[in-house]
């Protein structure tokens, strides 16, 4: 199913019974968070708050609150179909030379499809139907959520930040939270390894005294939003990838105050600049860890212009102790990650980011072990292959007879196949999410790998245990008797 814009997606979800219109007055201060949190935990619908207290702009929440809705947003009917998207990304990330003329012809349609999905730039766009500039800019007119009692201020959460480095052809899309600190100022919290921060750093090195142009799209179409959180190869723009997901070219328009291109059908666009050296204390905020994070300094984004559609919809979320929307996104994107990892490590059978692990802090890998030390190679590969996993603290590796998504299986493997000293890998002084207050130094901490695989000769001198398995003939006989036994 193709969704041209957020409104098209809302309509499609409503027809499926996946969206609920909330007509009662609900405050964006704390109340929306509580309602969305309860709804998400019951795997409930997306919520369109039509009467936010004190505002005349509707708020869309819990949009990606189930893996199924994430799949729909990526153009799939089921989460299992996301594996095919992962296979495409794996191919584009590391394309193999054709093995012959026939193989070359078979791959040609893929390349043609990618080339055909170059974004389309419009002269006029719905996102610029209304233009607010200068002293009329007032972010307090947008119903930005204040999510938790201890939060420092209202927080923009689903802002799609568009940047471009001075030495790069392509633009970068990233989702970074933004603390509102005035009618026209927000704090741009981007971590140092993220694309927006890297672009800004390059700009400051080349133009240390010039303001850096930035645009933030609020309420883009689902494919563009999700394209920004997917491990897209550096050779492919997020806009082109969104076109592949959607099945049609992403439509853009030039920002009014810069050369940046923004989604033509976004509900709201913030345009402005970051002045090198202008920083502010950000936080504290309740985060996806379930705790309030420390205060840290980040650049200030000055909003010089707000453009929006007529009767815009504000798209928002909250983060908190899992499950929350980032955790649900992690569950769905699991299916995208698996083929990408398998491309580099064919021995991997499954890969799982348990939502209880705060989206990415713990990973479970099942594999077909082939030699002593193989599990350690795989765990090191997980940490280093995709930048999405550089902050993963714990990697558990098991054999392929274990279900990575069943803690009963995983814990059994850990307790029966591991010696704590021999089978634990500790790595010190590695990059850690600065939100992780458990690390001894902000941004720097350790990682642990757990080898819960069967041990091969060379890894142990002992006779290894054989798993207990019932006689298949006995199981078949009991299957035949089961109804007669009257047990259930």
From Swiss-Prot:
Keywords: Cell membrane, Decarboxylase, Flavoprotein, FMN, Lyase, Manganese, Membrane, Metal-binding, Ubiquinone biosynthesis. Mn(2+) binds at residues 172, 238. Its EC number is 4.1.1.98. GO terms for biological process: ubiquinone biosynthetic process. The keyword Flavoprotein applies. Homohexamer. PANTHER family: 3-OCTAPRENYL-4-HYDROXYBENZOATE CARBOXY-LYASE-RELATED (PTHR30108), FERULIC ACID DECARBOXYLASE 1 (PTHR30108:SF17). This is 3-octaprenyl-4-hydroxybenzoate carboxy-lyase. The gene is ubiD.
